[in-house]
Design a protein with these regions (language model features):
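Regulatory sensory and allosteric helical modules in signal-transduction proteins
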Residues: 98-139
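Short regulatory/linker helices and ligand/cofactor-binding micro-motifs at input modules
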Residues: 32-33, 44-60
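Regulatory loop-to-helix N-cap segments in sensory/regulatory domains
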Residues: 2-12, 165-182
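Short hydrophobic beta-strand micro-motif common in sensory/regulatory domains
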Residues: 144-154
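Short, low-complexity N-terminal regulatory "tails/caps" that precede and couple sensory modules
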Residues: 1-41
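Signal-transmission/dimerization alpha-helices at domain junctions
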Residues: 28, 154-160, 179-198
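Conserved nucleotide-binding and Mg2+-coordinating catalytic segments in signaling enzymes
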Residues: 202-215
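Helix-loop-beta substructure at the N-terminus of cytosolic sensory domains
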Residues: 55-102
Length: 215
């Protein structure tokens, strides 16, 4: 038998032994199943994160959730938090913030934060081709893309949470965007409550005459 005949026979056997090609309907059904599975996973993870946020009643606990627990929870490599602090009020009430280093940044000028978003701040997914990658997570190596969540108070930008990943191609569907928008709104609300609680706590501990701490 010639080499050409042998090759033809091998090709025919491989084709006959190959699994059947999935139809278009089967492929669509498989993609739908995968999407539903992913959405259920994200929903469960989001519910768990919501419970962690609600349990973090103290400002320090909330920072720990945002900068340590949240990236681990969603398999991001790192998290970075920018906060608008024009009067240094946050600097006075955040205890132990230095432990987070450059991952927690207090900005007296809102310009740098506003430059990250459009006129109406919304969730942004940026990659290495975006110039904003030179502004966020600057000290991190190997980060290929970042998710940016704007933190708003009455429509005003008061913070920006950045989550870095090594994934290069990441597509957000409508359901994922809605879920992230909900989480961003919840983080903003929890942050406002935690700041207010911390400020009240410090006022209670101040002597009304000397404004010196009682403890």
């Amino acid at each position: 038998m010639s080499d050409e005949q042998n090759f033809s026979r091998i090709q025919r056997e491989e084709v006959e032994g190959a699994p059947p090609v999935a139809s278009g309907a089967a492929l669509r059904q498989r993609r739908l199943t995968e999407t539903v599975t992913l959405n259920r996973y994200l929903y469960r993870q989001s519910q768990h994160l919501e419970h962690m946020l609600l349990d973090a009643v103290e400002l320090q606990s909330l920072l720990e959730v945002l900068l340590v627990s949240l990236p681990r929870h969603f398999s991001f490599r790192v998290a970075e938090l920018w906060l608008y602090d024009p009067d240094k009020d946050l600097a006075r009430i955040i205890v132990g913030g230095e432990r987070y280093g450059h991952y927690l940044q207090l900005h007296q000028d809102a310009f740098a934060m506003q430059e990250l978003y459009g006129l109406e701040p919304d969730i942004e997914w940026i990659d290495a081709t975006d110039s904003r990658m030179f502004e966020v997570l600057k000290s991190e190596y190997g980060i290929s893309s970042a998710l940016m969540l704007p933190l708003l108070e009455s429509g005003r930008l008061v913070g920006s949470l950045h989550l870095g990943t090594e994934e290069k191609n990441f597509i957000l569907g409508d359901e994922e965007e809605d879920l992230l928008a909900h989480l961003a709104a919840m983080i903003s609300c929890c942050f406002k409550l935690a700041v207010t609680r911390q400020q009240v706590s410090q006022l209670i501990m101040l002597d009304p005459l000397t404004q010196v701490g009682n403890l």
